[in-house]
Swiss-Prot record:
Disulfide bonds join 77-86, 99-115, 114-125, 147-192, 191-200, 223-269, 268-276, 288-302, 301-312, 339-384, 383-392, 415-461, 460-471, 484-500, 499-510, 537-582, 581-590. Residues 19-24 form a propeptide. Belongs to the ALB/AFP/VDB family. The gene is ALB. This is Albumin. It comes from Equus asinus (Donkey). The lineage of its organism: Eukaryota, Metazoa, Chordata, Craniata, Vertebrata. Keywords: Calcium, Cleavage on pair of basic residues, Copper, Disulfide bond, Lipid-binding, Metal-binding, Methylation, Phosphoprotein, Repeat, Secreted, Signal, Zinc.
Length: 607
């Protein structure tokens, strides 16, 4: 890369940065501005989501009352921006409203102390009390009752959906949840007139639930990235991913989008859902206006209404690679001026490297690309301090080979196992693996993570070879972030804390490198942990699996050094026991009689 070109890139990058950072014209009333930009429907939906994410235990009706009060106030300010209190910040207005809840102290305890603080400390305090694992009942489809409620009052029905999802997922991407609510509405509009409401609705709602869980996990990873590793880490992640998606866009264009996208997600992660949704709409507009220079895959997205358009752009497939991309070595391993470029503008030079490398490798995961960039940076730090830097960094690309081979080998090994045993037994293998790595972690968390990791096999192992690695490692990043978030709430393992906090890019290799925790004192064998009753027979299949997998994790905690064959024997005996007693005429009597025998045989098998 010639130096004049690099200077131009630096100038463009800086311009793009400042275009993204400078806010639009200031308004007398922020709340009036957002109300006018978003419209009443989306404004109310986003305020409901924001309040539900902060106060996760409050009844729906209480939130509706707060939302209506805020909306009426916004209308007043939209009519007259100079009216009383209309010049207050959104944090001040929303925080004041949350602090009027009469049951705040009784329901939330320490969260009520936040109300004694001033902004911005008050909002930061509210954020720290968001609960990623709230104690809320499972939501089960009830097609007849739900259709009756939908037909009676569609707006209330959809509001209840926003509320229920938001309070279970306190970092859900606000504007994206509005999109999913539209999907939810479409499912009920289609299925409620059907003769077989359940047959029509349940598969659709199950599929929507999977999309919701995936969307929630993606945004939680973004928010964790900000919280634990800062804005620079999020920008690096975004440069890598967007360069893969938009390989025809130049670096300045990718940089501008990354800067704006960073602002959008920072706002949503910070609870600023109105600003986030408004800025996302602006970014969507910009991308569609400049689609010719960004990606040939955007046209179908840009013809859609706003919520669908933004969702479509976020999920758009990678564009075709330009056919004339030169080899990277000339600019990043052979150029004698590399150290000068690097020292003059480190972040821009490294960003350019990450962009160029990522756009050529849609077959790599984002975290692998970040590990490569990190290795490149470390090499330049070392070589640029030596007597002959060009000779030192000339072979830097050779250092990337083991970084690439390690995850490729891991994906092949795991996909081979998945194809051999199927999803359920693959989950079991992962539950055993992770229980041995971190036996101190709670059994429900280990089972949840093992099941999620196991589903990655179903999602990724059937894909073409070129897509397996990015699919697997990108989804593993989501599952491991969930483990880190839950572990942070109740930390029990220094090894897990280290993997979670050292480096976002190195998380997966760190977890893969964990072995049997030799310092762990095995859990005492308790018969009641392995005692079951007839109610297991009527459970849905997934809940039945969770019961069995919980027993498996407990067995490993009791006997961490149990062999694969020992565990297979015990699990096989357990499955046979459940099948036998669920088929018996007197199920409870069978469980009472056969259960102690199972416990005894399990202890013997593990001895």
């Amino acid at each position: 890369m010639k130096w004049v070109t690099f200077v131009s890139l630096l100038f463009l990058f800086s311009s793009a940065y400042f275009r993204g950072v400078l806010r639009r014209d200031t308004h007398k009333s922020e709340i009036a501005h957002r109300f006018n930009d978003l419209g009443e429907k989306h404004f109310k939906g986003l305020v409901l989501v924001a309040f539900s994410q902060y106060l996760q235990q409050c009844p729906f009706e209480d939130h509706v009352k707060l939302v209506n009060e805020v909306t009426e106030f916004a209308k007043k300010c939209a009519a007259d921006e100079s009216a009383e209190n209309c010049d207050k910040s959104l944090h001040t207005l929303f925080g004041d409203k949350l602090c009027t809840v009469a049951t705040l102290r009784a329901t939330y305890g320490e969260l009520a102390d936040c109300c004694e603080k001033q902004e911005p400390e008050r909002n930061e305090c509210f954020l720290t009390h968001k609960d990623d694992h709230p104690n809320l009942p499972k939501l089960k489809p009830e097609p007849d009752a739900q259709c009756a409620a939908f037909q009676e009052d569609p707006d209330k029905f959809l509001g209840k959906y926003l509320y229920e999802v938001a309070r279970r997922h306190p970092y859900f991407y606000g504007p994206e949840l509005l999109f999913h609510a539209e999907e939810y509405k479409a499912d009920f509009t289609e299925c409620c007139p059907a003769d077989d409401k359940a047959g029509c609705l349940i598969p659709k709602l199950d599929a929507l639930k999977e999309r919701i869980l995936l969307s929630s996990a993606k945004e939680r990873l973004k928010c964790s990235s900000f919280q634990k590793f800062g804005e620079r880490a999020f920008k690096a992640w975004s440069v890598a991913r967007l360069s893969q998606k938009f390989p025809k866009a130049d670096f300045a264009e990718v940089s501008k989008i990354v800067t704006d996208l960073t602002k959008v997600h920072k706002e949503c992660c910070h609870g600023d859902l109105l600003e986030c949704a408004d800025d996302r709409a602006d970014l969507t507009k910009y991308i569609c206006e400049h689609q010719d220079s960004i990606s040939g895959k955007l046209k179908a997205c840009c013809d859609k209404p706003l919520l669908q358009k933004s969702h479509c752009i976020a999920e758009v497939k990678e564009d075709d690679l330009p056919s004339d991309l030169p080899a990277l070595a000339a600019d990043f391993a052979e150029d004698k001026e590399i150290c000068k470029h690097y020292k003059d503008a480190k972040d821009v030079f490294l960003g350019t490297f990450l962009y160029e490398y990522s756009r050529r490798h849609p077959d790599y995961s984002v975290s692998l690309l970040l590990r490569i960039a990190k290795t490149y940076e470390a090499t330049l730090e070392k070589c640029c301090a030596e007597a002959d830097p060009p000779a030192c960094y000339a072979t830097v690309f050779d250092q990337f080979t083991p970084l690439v081979e390690e995850p490729k080998s891991l994906v092949k090994k795991n996909c081979d196992l998945f194809e051999e045993v199927g999803e359920y037994d693959f989950q079991n293998a992962l539950i055993v693996r992770y229980t041995k790595k971190a036996p101190q972690v709670s059994t429900p968390t280990l089972v949840e993570i093992g099941r999620t990791l196991g589903k990655v096999g179903s999602r990724c192992c059937k894909l073409p070879e070129s897509e397996r690695l990015p699919c697997s490692e990108n989804h593993l990043a989501l599952a491991l972030n969930r483990l880190c978030v839950l572990h942070e709430k109740t930390p029990v393992s220094e090894k897990i804390t280290k993997c979670c906090t050292d480096s976002l890019a190195e998380r997966r290799p760190c977890f893969s490198a964990l072995e049997l925790d030799e310092g762990y004192i095995p859990k005492e064998f308790k018969a009641e942990t392995f005692t079951f009753h007839a109610d297991i027979c009527t459970l849905p299949e997934d809940e039945k699996q969770i019961k069995k997998q919980s027993a498996l994790a407990e067995l490993v905690k009791h006997k961490p050094k149990a062999t694969k064959e020992q565990l297979k024997t015990v699990l096989g005996n357990f499955s046979a026991f459940v099948a036998k007693c669920c088929g018996a005429e007197d199920k409870e009597a069978c469980f009472a009689e056969e259960g102690p025998k199972l416990v005894a045989s399990s202890q013997l098998a593990l001895a």
